[in-house]
Swiss-Prot record:
GO terms for cellular component: apical plasma membrane; cytosol; microvillus; microvillus membrane; nuclear speck. The lineage of its organism: Eukaryota, Metazoa, Chordata, Craniata, Vertebrata. Glycans are attached at N80, N115, N169, N293, N382, N440, N520. Its EC number is 3.1.3.48. This is Receptor-type tyrosine-protein phosphatase H. The gene is Ptprh. It is found in: Cell projection, Microvillus membrane; Cytoplasm; Apical cell membrane. GO terms for biological process: peptidyl-tyrosine dephosphorylation involved in inactivation of protein kinase activity. The chain crosses the membrane at residues 605-625. Residues 626-971 are cytoplasmic.
Length: 971
């Protein structure tokens, strides 16, 4: 029978297997195992049945043998989400058509399967830090080899939030949060700190913190932490930090005085001293702490309290890491005693007393007193009292006695005086001690010799001492001596005693003074149109009490505060030359300056003014005649004489309307008469400070100067002549002579002075009655902030808090902060906008409403200083508003009102208050309106000199009324 795969020449009832040849296997059952075949090879099987030598037809299935498994399966690497495997191919004849399958399974969890035709694969998508069983098998033609299996793990995730918990000089403590992964079992954390080019220290732990010790002090380290699980490591988390430096060595006090302690030390014992900063801190228990730093190994901590105990610490910083402190206790030196003096002395002792030092604490003080004789004996005593007797001294000797203070072994500086014990057998004292003469720098003394039998071998000692200051001592064998080297204008106590054979008599003493120094006249300027001069001189060295000023035959005495400020001498003749001297006076001793020649101005200006005044007289006379004729035509009856040019006093409220109507007749003739009577009020008062050379630039208008007696003084600034001056005056009110302050609108150079005045007076209220610019001319500097950005003026900071604007006024809430005193002052500025330049408001109503609002605010803020009111010059609009407020309150309180009397009173405190007749009339109209009576329209006018090189008349009649003695009689 023919058989597939060739003729094998064998015919039996059996199963035939063909493999490039033939193999025959007999089987009596229904299955058979064929071995010794090649793996992963294709075979053709023929199967038939034989019985009794007869065979069935063959059945021919085709099949393949399974491949062999892979060899040498191994892990090539892993990270936190994958495992990389590799292997060698199976040991078989053919490797064609092989597919490798890889599967990694986590117990009870995730399984990931991959296949490849290579001999390596990466299984990803795994969980970090997890154990996996990984298997690899081979597939060919749908048949699979056996599995090769190994166990491995993914790398853990890195730690989170690695940080330094602390460090000292040999260790760094690290902490972290565990990795973010499903399982934290079986984790080991490794920490390693490495110094560049040097030491490395490694530690491991199962906790989330570790201390790496054995490090070098004051060194920079890179510290890394990683996680291990099953021998697999995470990536590193790394930070840079440093160990603390070692502490300083041998900390010691090098010295101290009453306000500081000087410390020194040796640098720390460590490999590197680069980049070290040393910090020193001295703390007083329950009180002050002062801290300083340096890169040196010594420092002085100052700003301490005298005679106080401090704990002083020094530590080292490097890269923001600090060593431990080295600490010692020490005390600042006490302040010296005050007012050391001799209470008494006898032959063998000197009793001293003093006042305790000026310092916070007087506890634990010991006072030491020592009296020493030159080249000889020294005696020292101590006490806790403020007086002591130093005994055991030799009689009749001069001693230098010193007293100092000790606290905690630290000593103050010495206070010293010279005195002597009483001699046992010495010369009698000198007689008739007297001053023979003195000059700026010396005092000449003379005396009669002592009353005794022998005058041989006598030495006279003279000593002049200034209280709390200089002492000069001289000796001579004569009965006179000049003690020089003294200060001019100073009081001295001068003593003379006798020495014989080293033994001293008692002292004879007198009080005298040196002559003051003469001044140097710096300028003499003509003023008042040639009728006066302004004389200025420099302050002399030394002391002085007053100055005698002489210009020609004019003589006056001025107090000592006027040096450097200038004095005006009046009643001189124009176009003349005068000899001027200034004599310094101290204790009835005088020193006259070198004379200078002063020249008054030419009288040409005055002559022109006189001609102008005469012409004005003529014009006014013609005007008076015209008005009188007009009045006679309009009013047949003659006006009673007691109504012409009368000076009205207080007027009853019910009569005020009649008073106004009467004055309004004949074009306000009555008001004109009243106002003329006010023209010269207040003139002739002293304005020396305002006229001083250094203050001239601070005045906006030359003819509006505050009187000396009523001006608002500022606290003077050190070494700034004229810094106490501002053009401002205290003004009377209803209840007080200083109820208001009237001032000019600030100039650019006086804004700081203006805010100083507000602060010093503690005023809560500013009233501004002008606009900064009017009719194209600057009337006031813009002295408050424009917005939220504060303005700085010296020590004062001005802030705008809020602003409320209405049709006729604006109210600003301001805050003043004193940067040195750290104090705040709140205030409001009431800015009236509707007062026209060179005029008066069109109606009383807005001003009355403004005044009512202002008065309500002032009644609420009674704890501060006086309200400060200004316009441009601080006289016209300012005077009108002050008068209106006071007179309306007078009406409310008394039922009376006296405009004339109050304006007169204001002009006694500041010139030109209620500056124009129109303002005077408007004042009456406002009062009348407040009594519910109508007010007529007003004619505007305003006047003053501008502070410019050429004087400009803004209102000739008002200025003439103020500066001349002209007074019109009648209308």
């Amino acid at each position: 029978m023919a058989r597939a795969g060739g003729n094998c020449g064998v015919w039996r009832s059996l199963v035939l297997l063909g493999l490039y040849g033939c193999s025959v296997v007999r089987a009596a059952g229904t299955s058979v195992t064929v071995d010794r075949h090649a793996p992963a090879s294709s075979y053709e099987f023929s199967m038939w049945v034989e019985k009794d030598g007869v065979s069935s037809s063959p059945q021919i299935p085709v099949t393949t043998a399974a491949p062999n498994p892979v060899r040498n399966l191994r892990v090539e690497g892993q990270n936190n989400i994958s495992i990389s495997l590799s292997w060698e191919p199976p040991d078989q004849s053919s490797l064609q058509g092989l597919t490798y399958w890889t599967q990694c399974s986590r117990h009870g969890g995730q399984t990931e399967t991959r296949n490849t035709t290579d001999t390596s694969v990466t299984v990803d998508g795994l969980d970090p830090g997890s154990s996996y069983e990984c298997s690899v098998w081979v597939e060919k033609d749908g048949l699979y080899s056996k599995n090769e299996t190994l166990n491995t793990s993914t790398a853990p995730n890195p730690v989170r939030n690695l940080r330094v918990e602390g460090q000292n000089n040999i260790s760094i403590s690290l902490s972290w949060e565990p990795p973010d992964q499903p399982s934290l079992q079986g984790l080991t954390y490794w920490a390693q700190c490495s110094r560049h080019g040097g030491q490395t220290e490694t530690r491991n732990t199962a906790d989330t913190s570790v201390t790496v010790d054995g490090l070098d002090p004051g060194s920079s380290y890179e510290c890394s932490v990683w996680v291990e699980k099953d021998g697999v490591y995470s990536t590193n988390e790394t930070l840079n930090t440093s160990t603390a430096p070692n502490p300083v060595r041998n900390l010691r006090v090098e010295g101290q005085n009453n306000i500081s302690i000087s410390l020194s030390w040796e640098p720390p014992d460590q490999p590197s001293l680069q980049g070290l900063t040393y910090w020193a801190q001295c703390s007083r228990h329950g009180g002050q702490t002062e801290t300083r730093n340096t890169t040196d190994t010594s420092i002085t901590v100052d700003g301490l309290d005298p005679g106080s105990s401090y704990e002083c610490s020094v530590w080292v910083e490097k890269d923001g890491v600090y060593s431990t402190n080295e600490t010692l206790s020490n005390t600042t030196a006490p302040n010296p005693v005050r007012n050391l003096r001799v209470k008494s002395q006898n032959n063998f002792s000197i009793s001293l007393s003093w006042e305790p030092p000026d310092q916070p604490s007087l506890q634990g003080l010991i006072y030491w007193a020592q009296c020493s004789r030159h080249g000889g004996q020294t005696e020292t005593r101590n006490t806790t009292d403020t007086s002591v007797t130093v005994d055991g001294l030799d009689p009749g000797f001069l001693y230098k006695c010193s007293v100092w203070v000790e606290k905690d072994g630290v000593y103050s500086t010495n206070e010293t005086l010279n005195t002597s014990t009483v001699p046992i057998s010495a010369s009698n004292p000198v007689r008739n001690l007297r001053v023979e003469g003195q000059n700026n720098f010396s005092i000449s003394l003379s005396w009669e010799p002592p009353d005794q039998s022998s005058l041989q071998g006598l030495t006279y000692w003279a000593q002049c001492s200034r209280h709390g200051g200089q002492t000069e001592t001289r000796n001579t064998a004569d009965t006179s001596v000049t003690v020089d080297g003294l200060d001019p204008g100073s009081s001295y106590e001068c003593s003379v005693w006798v020495e014989k054979d080293g033994v001293y008599s008692t002292n004879e003493t007198l009080n005298t003074s040196t002559v003051p120094a003469a001044v140097n006249i710096t300028s003499c300027i003509s003023t008042s149109g040639g009728y006066g001069v302004l004389l200025t001189w420099s302050c002399p060295s030394g002391g002085y009490e007053s100055f005698e000023v002489k210009v020609g035959r004019k003589w006056r005495s001025e107090n000592g505060s006027l040096c450097g400020k200038g004095v005006t001498v009046s009643d001189l003749e124009p176009a003349q030359s005068y000899t001027a001297t200034v004599t310094t006076v101290f204790k009835d001793l005088k020193a006259q300056s070198l004379s200078t020649t002063c020249h008054t101005e030419s009288a040409a200006i005055i002559a022109g003014a006189i001609v102008g005044i005469l012409l004005l007289f003529i014009l006014v006379g013609l005007l008076i005649v015209f008005l009188k004729r007009r009045r006679k035509k309009r009013q047949p009856k003659e006006v009673p004489k007691d109504l012409v040019c009368s000076c009205p006093g207080d007027i009853l409220a019910k009569d005020f309307a009649d008073h106004v109507r009467e004055n309004e007749k004949d074009s306000n003739c009555g008001f004109a008469e009243e106002y003329q009577q006010l023209a010269l009020e207040g003139q002739g008062q002293s304005q020396i400070t305002a006229s001083a050379l250094e203050n001239r630039s601070k005045n906006r208008y030359r003819n509006v100067l505050p009187y000396d007696w009523s001006r608002v003084p500022l606290q003077p600034l050190q070494e700034e002549p004229g810094s106490d001056y501002i053009n401002a005056s205290f003004m009377p009110g209803l209840w007080s002579p200083k109820e208001f302050i009237a001032t000019q609108g600030p100039l650019p150079n006086t804004v700081g002075d203006f805010w100083r005045m507000v602060w010093e007076q503690q005023s809560h209220t500013l009233v501004m009655l002008t606009n900064c610019m009017e009719s194209g001319r600057v009337k006031c500097e813009h002295y408050w902030p424009l917005d939220a950005q504060p303005c700085i003026h010296g020590q004062l900071q001005v802030m705008l808090i809020s602003e409320e604007a209405s049709e006729n006024w604006t109210v600003r809430h301001l805050q003043l902060f004193h940067m040195k005193e750290q104090q705040t002052l709140s205030l409001r500025q009431f800015h009236y906008l509707a007062w026209p330049d060179h005029g008066v408001p069109y109606s009383p109503d807005p001003l009355l409403a403004f005044r009512k609002m202002l008065r309500q605010w002032m009644d609420q803020t009674t704890d501060g200083g006086p309200p400060i009111v200004h316009c441009s010059a601080g006289v016209g609009r300012t005077g009108t508003l002050i008068a209106l407020d006071v007179l309306l309150r007078q009406l409310e309180c008394e039922g009376l009102v006296g405009p004339f009397s109050f304006v007169k009173k204001m002009r006694e405190s500041r010139p030109l208050m209620v500056q124009t007749e129109a303002q005077y009339v408007f004042l009456h109209q406002c009062i009348l309106k407040s009594l519910q009576k109508p007010a007529p329209a007003l004619v505007p006018e305003e006047a003053m000199y501008e502070n410019v090189a050429s004087l400009v008349y803004e209102n000739a009649s008002a200025i003439m009324a103020h500066e001349s003695e002209f007074s019109a009689s009648g209308c």
